[in-house]
Amino acid sequence: NHKLGWRGTTNTLLNFGEGKYPVDGKAGAIGYLVGSPGKGLACMFHMMNEARIGVGTAATMLGMAGYHASLEYAKNRPQGRPVGPEGKDAAKPQVRIIEHADVRRMLLAQKSYAEGALALELYCARLVDEQKTGDEKAADEARILLEVLTPIAKSWPSEWCLEANSLAIQVHGGYGYTRD
């Protein structure tokens, strides 16, 4: 499994029936009942909730990394001449691309996506803590909020921090995803 940009995360591929140890001499897998009959999926989702928040946090950090890399690049990359009342002056030194309006727009969009995602992830993490350590009323309120926010905490950063990194690639001149 070679996911670009996702180094250091715990993920794996599961194959059922292709293993070294067949069941009763045939391809297959041994299954175990999780929870009560008909309730296993609910148990699995309960178990996976914190992992789903973790996936959203990983996407958030990738978006943050892309933003900070493109911000640093934009602060240092010269391109174009300053525009004055009489147009561009070729005799003047080049300006950094952070001074270009469209580059600035892309940087601000990246920052808003990444910081918005971070705020959501930190809020969900606080709710997880509240659910485990708060009094009964606070824990129940946190549980209810997490039921709604957990899928969002995974999907929203995954979608919008990818968009932030698409903008980061544009700020870098469209080089794409490269390794030095």
Which residues are covered by each model-predicted region?
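Internal glycine-rich alpha/beta core junctions
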Residues: N1-D180
